[in-house]
Amino acid sequence: MMEAAAAAAAAFRPEERPTPGWHDAALLMDDGTVREHAFRNGPLSQLIRRVLPPPPDAEDDVVFASELCFYCSGRFNRRSSVFSIYWQKHSDLVYALTGITHCAKLVVECGQLGSSRLRWRDGDASGEERRGDDDSRDELYDVPGIYMIRVNDGGSTGPRHVIWPGTSVLWAPDVVITTVQRRISAARALVNTFRQYFFLLERRSHEELVLCPPEMEERLAPLLQSATRGDSDMFDGVVASAYHRLRMSNIPRSSARLLEHCVGLAGAKKLLLLDVPRLENYFLCQVCLYELDEDEMGEEMLGMLAGKPEDAAVSGASGGFLLHRKTMKLAACLCLLLNSLHLHQEALEALDPPPPRVEENDLVNVVLRRYYRSHGGVQARTLAAARALLADYAETFSPLGSFTRLGYDRLVSADAGVSRRHLVALLRA
C-alpha cells in the first residue's frame, strides 16, 4: 500500500500531488491506486486510438473512462465524476457508445461525489479541496449512468445544475463495461503525454504572451500552472475551432438559440480583456472560466460550436492558438496590479493629481466593489486608482503600460498575491 501511494505522488508534478477523490472520471483511492470504468469495444477503441495512444496497462479493444473524459474535453485534473459528450463534436463517439443517431448532448456519470467534499478552499490558489464533517464517501458505480440532456440556453450549465431525466440512455449492447483497478503511473500516462505546461517560464517563447516583467511572471507562474485544466494541444484545437466559427459567423443551426443568449450576456460585460469584438471577449473569458472548473457557459459554447477534432487544423489551431492563453494571462496581470494597489493603498496618498472621484453608481465601480469584497479595508482612493487603471486599460489593453502611465509604479510595488478566486472574479466582470 505504501509503495502504491509513493508511486502516486511520483506520477504527479510537485504542485499537482493529488488528494484521494475524483480526477477526470476516475477515483483515486487512499492507497494510491485508481478505480475506474473500462469499456471494451473494437470500433470504440479504434476511434479513440486514432488520437490517444494506449496506456501501458490497456488491453486490446479497451479504453478507460479517464481517456474518454479527456478525449471529449481536452482537459486534465478535473475534480469530477461526470463528463459531457456533444453531438456537434463527437457524433461518432455517441453512436459507438449508444447507437443513437442524433442528439444534442450526453452526460456520463461514473460515480457519486461525496457530499462532504467541498470543491475549493476560499482564497486558495492551488484549488485544493477540503472535507467537511459529513462522512459521505465518493462512490464508483458498477455501471456508469448515461443521460440525454437538453442543450442549456441560459444559467449554469454544469452537471451539478442539470435536472436529470427519469430514465437513462441504454449503453450499446456490444459495449462491455467493467470496473478496474490501475496503478496511477499507468492512469497518469495520458497526462504526461499530452500536457503542455504552457505557463511554465521556460515555455515563455511566444512574444504575444510576454505581458509582464520577469519578476511578475514568476509571481504568477504557480497560479497559472496549478489552476488551469486545459493545458493541452487538444484543448487549444477545440477552442480554436469554436472561435473560428464564432468569428466567421459559421454557426450551426442547433446552436443559434444558445448563441442568442450569449450575445445578451456578452453585452452585459463591464470589462473587456482583449481588443476583439465583445462576443469574442465573452467567449474567451468563458473558456478561461471553464478551464478553472467554473460551471458557466464555456463548456456549452465549446460543445455546440467546435467541429470535429480533425477540423482544428482548418481553424488554424495547428499554428498555435493563443488568444485564450493571452486572456488568462491578462486577467492574472490585472489581478496582481489591483491587489497591489490595495496592499499598498497608503502610498496612494502621494498621487498628484489624485485619481478622479468615482461615482457610486458607476458600473466599473460596481465591478471593483465586488472584486475587492473579500479584501477588507478598501479605501476610497484605492477604488479611484483601480477605476483609473481599468479605464486606461480599456484604451491600451496593456496592464503594466497603464499602471506605469498613471504613475502607480513609482509608489506601489507589484508584489501582491493572486488567487484563483481573484481570477474568477475578474473574468466574470
UniProtKB/Swiss-Prot annotation:
Keyword Chloroplast in record: no
GO cellular component: host cell cytoplasm; viral tegument
Signals that turn on the gene: Expressed during the late times of infection.
Cellular compartments annotated: Virion; Virion tegument; Host cytoplasm
Pfam families associated with the record: Herpes_U59
Keywords associated with the record: Host cytoplasm, Virion, Virion tegument
Subunit-structure text: Interacts with UL48.
UniProt record similarity statement: Belongs to the herpesviridae U59/UL88 family.
Function statement: Plays a role in incorporating a subset of tegument proteins into the virion.
Protein name: Protein UL88
Gene: UL88
